[in-house]
Amino acid sequence: QIIKNTHKIQEKNGIEKSEVKEGGFSIPMTFPLEISEKSLKHGMNFSIEMETGTGKTYVYLRTIHELHQHYGWSKFIIVVPSVAIREGVLKNSAITREHFANLYNKPEMDYYVWDSKKTGQAREFATNDTLQIMVITIDSFAKAQNVMNKQSDYGRPLDFIKATHPVVILDEPQNMETDIRRNAIAGLNP
């Protein structure tokens, strides 16, 4: 179905259709997608590459709302490489909040930054049935000694998140290519 949907969008926008190949298919230019048993182990991976300042944050925030509205998906984690980028995402979210509320009939949602001093956030993320969007820096959960990975009275915060199989969005993924960071992202159980 993904291939059909991709072809439909490509055709509508005058983009050359992807070729279906053994083990996956190739989407030209900015949408590389490989489908194989190995690539599906941690879910499907889409790469959307856009020049700086062209609305990448808007695109993924709108995608979150579209996935929530059309498919009922409600658990989203935006992983960023630094506090500076996290702050930019938060600013963009604040600027577009009313816009998205109007476009999507004011969905009930929680949008917050992971705070290691508030470990209950992970449990709330997992148990709340409204749209949940958590912004987190990669360094907040990449190492075993991070609070996200430590046992508490209620369990490990990471275990609550893993149980939801969240949609994980990587902002600036080229800054998350080390094995430690890749394993940390896979550990979110997307």
What are these regions (language model features)?
Residues 1-190:
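RecA-like P-loop NTPase motor core of helicase/translocase proteins
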